[in-house]
Protein backbone atom coordinates (compact mmCIF):
# COMPACT_ATOMS: atom_id res chain seq x y z
CA UNK A 1 0.00 0.00 0.00
CA UNK A 2 1.17 3.53 -0.76
CA UNK A 3 0.60 6.51 1.53
CA UNK A 4 0.48 10.21 0.63
CA UNK A 5 3.47 12.30 1.64
CA UNK A 6 3.27 15.55 -0.33
CA UNK A 7 1.36 17.30 -3.11
CA UNK A 8 3.19 20.07 -4.97
CA UNK A 9 1.64 23.15 -6.61
CA UNK A 10 1.79 21.52 -10.07
CA UNK A 11 -0.26 18.54 -8.76
CA UNK A 12 2.80 16.31 -8.45
CA UNK A 13 2.01 13.59 -5.92
CA UNK A 14 4.71 12.02 -3.77
CA UNK A 15 3.73 8.84 -1.99
CA UNK A 16 5.62 6.19 -0.04
CA UNK A 17 5.24 2.58 1.01
CA UNK A 18 5.47 1.20 4.50
CA UNK A 19 8.96 0.05 5.44
CA UNK A 20 9.67 -3.38 3.98
CA UNK A 21 11.20 -6.21 6.04
CA UNK A 22 14.61 -5.42 4.52
CA UNK A 23 14.40 -1.77 5.66
CA UNK A 24 13.66 -0.28 2.25
CA UNK A 25 10.95 2.24 1.44
CA UNK A 26 9.53 2.86 -2.03
CA UNK A 27 8.92 6.52 -2.90
CA UNK A 28 6.84 7.16 -6.01
CA UNK A 29 6.54 10.54 -7.74
CA UNK A 30 3.84 11.23 -10.34
CA UNK A 31 2.99 14.42 -12.25
CA UNK A 32 0.03 14.85 -14.65
CA UNK A 33 1.30 15.58 -18.16
CA UNK A 34 -0.33 16.21 -21.54
CA UNK A 35 2.30 14.31 -23.55
CA UNK A 36 2.90 11.32 -21.25
CA UNK A 37 -0.43 11.33 -19.37
CA UNK A 38 1.73 11.03 -16.23
CA UNK A 39 5.43 11.58 -15.73
CA UNK A 40 6.77 9.34 -12.97
CA UNK A 41 9.81 8.11 -11.09
CA UNK A 42 10.56 5.70 -8.26
CA UNK A 43 13.21 6.09 -5.57
CA UNK A 44 14.14 3.38 -3.06
CA UNK A 45 15.30 4.56 0.33
CA UNK A 46 17.63 4.43 2.16
CA UNK A 47 19.89 3.77 -0.87
CA UNK A 48 18.45 6.56 -3.07
CA UNK A 49 18.22 4.08 -5.95
CA UNK A 50 16.21 5.65 -8.79
CA UNK A 51 14.33 3.60 -11.40
CA UNK A 52 11.35 3.66 -13.76
CA UNK A 53 11.90 7.32 -14.67
CA UNK A 54 9.66 8.57 -17.47
CA UNK A 55 9.05 12.07 -18.79
CA UNK A 56 11.03 14.18 -16.33
CA UNK A 57 13.78 16.49 -17.56
CA UNK A 58 17.22 16.38 -15.94
CA UNK A 59 16.37 19.62 -14.13
CA UNK A 60 13.08 18.24 -12.79
CA UNK A 61 14.76 15.03 -11.69
CA UNK A 62 17.52 16.97 -9.91
CA UNK A 63 14.82 18.90 -8.03
CA UNK A 64 13.09 15.68 -6.93
CA UNK A 65 16.38 14.06 -5.92
CA UNK A 66 17.14 17.01 -3.65
CA UNK A 67 13.57 17.08 -2.31
CA UNK A 68 13.69 13.38 -1.40
CA UNK A 69 17.16 13.72 0.19
CA UNK A 70 15.95 16.66 2.28
CA UNK A 71 12.87 14.75 3.45
CA UNK A 72 14.10 11.15 3.57
CA UNK A 73 14.27 11.14 7.37
CA UNK A 74 10.57 12.03 7.53
CA UNK A 75 9.55 9.52 4.88
CA UNK A 76 11.48 6.75 6.64
CA UNK A 77 9.94 7.64 10.01
CA UNK A 78 6.41 7.74 8.55
CA UNK A 79 7.00 4.40 6.79
CA UNK A 80 8.02 2.80 10.12
CA UNK A 81 4.82 4.09 11.73
CA UNK A 82 2.71 2.66 8.90
CA UNK A 83 4.34 -0.73 9.37
CA UNK A 84 3.60 -0.69 13.10
CA UNK A 85 -0.08 0.13 12.67
CA UNK A 86 -1.09 -2.26 9.94
Language model regions located:
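Broad hydrophobic/π-residue packing in well-ordered secondary structure
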Residues: 4, 18, 79-82
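Acidic, low-complexity intrinsically disordered segments
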Residues: 55-86
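Negatively charged, low-complexity tracts enriched in Asp/Glu with abundant Ser/Thr
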Residues: 1-16
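A short, structured beta-strand/loop element
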Residues: 15-57
